[in-house]
Curated annotation (Swiss-Prot):
Record-level Gene Ontology MF annotations: G protein-coupled adenosine receptor activity
SMART domains (UniProt xref): 7TM_GPCR_Srsx
Classification via InterPro entries: Adeno_A3_rcpt, Adenosn_rcpt, GPCR_Rhodpsn, GPCR_Rhodpsn_7TM
PANTHER family: ADENOSINE RECEPTOR A3 (PTHR24246:SF2), OLFACTORY RECEPTOR AND ADENOSINE RECEPTOR (PTHR24246)
Residues in the Extracellular compartment per record: 1-15, 74-85, 150-178, 257-262
Alphabetic keyword roster: Cell membrane, Disulfide bond, G-protein coupled receptor, Glycoprotein, Lipoprotein, Membrane, Palmitate, Phosphoprotein, Receptor, Transducer, Transmembrane, Transmembrane helix
CDD domains, sorted: 7tmA_Adenosine_R_A3
Membrane topology designation: Multi-pass membrane protein
Name of the molecule in the record: Adenosine receptor A3
Coiled coil: none
Family note: Belongs to the G-protein coupled receptor 1 family.
GO cellular component: dendrite; plasma membrane; synapse
Amino acid sequence: MPDNSTTLFLAIRASYIVFEIVIGVCAVVGNVLVIWVIKLNPSLKTTTFYFIFSLALADIAVGFLVMPLAIVISLGITIGFYSCLVMSCLLLVFTHASIMSLLAIAVDRYLRVKLTVRYRRVTTQRRIWLALGLCWVVSLLVGFTPMFGWNMKPTLESARNYSDFQCKFDSVIPMEYMVFFSFFTWILIPLLLMCALYVYIFYIIRNKLVQSFSSFKETGAFYRREFKTAKSLFLVLALFAGCWLPLSIINCVTYFKCKVPDVVLLVGILLSHANSMMNPIVYACKIQKFKETYLLIFKARVTCQPSDSLDPSSEQNSE
């Protein structure tokens, strides 16, 4: 008969797997809906929403690939070292794809309020695709860096326990990589840069609104729309930071040889994955175009009408 500690361990693992499955399904369904909305609504085919499309793709990958892989890794199954390493690297790739997409969105909104008239000449279709490609190339390079030698294989071989290897994330990915390269270099620095950009965006908009109060109503309307959009996208950034920083802090604590309870680690992992299902909710609540298109899709599904000609009229809260 299993003792209480074993029963508790199994209950925690089972709960973790159930939550991962629920979060994964919600992330996939929600972000597929985001892509559907962008495809159907012509007014959303703008630079910012190309990057939101990229973010949604990364979140779909988290739900469809990362969460099943995270469940497999949490079980500590016995597989080859490099098979485990590839799975672990995929977890990292899509995390960094999300933050690179968020950075691209922040830069785009900055250019939108800074350049105004010259914005459309600067953000050409070619440059947009180059920026999207760069986001994913950087994510692949950062995420797959452990495949090029920065991994735990030398440590395992020197400890002579390589033959009975169990696949766990920290058994293949060094904490030095997670803390100094992945977190400090490619998560924390971009987060700080994005915060600085949004602070400057709000500063510019505030000044322009003050100036336009006694001049052109059209200018004031433009900057009020930009303010609403910037607030919504900053909320997306804040949620990303709030969901991912706890796990990064746990990694830092682990690096300095402090013991972290398994349940705390699992909650941190779940919180980071839950971020992938939050963005569609933010868009629905905060961006009018999304809300109206969501409702039209729902109405079309309920009444069995085709929805491929959607063109909802809504207030301009983006370009």
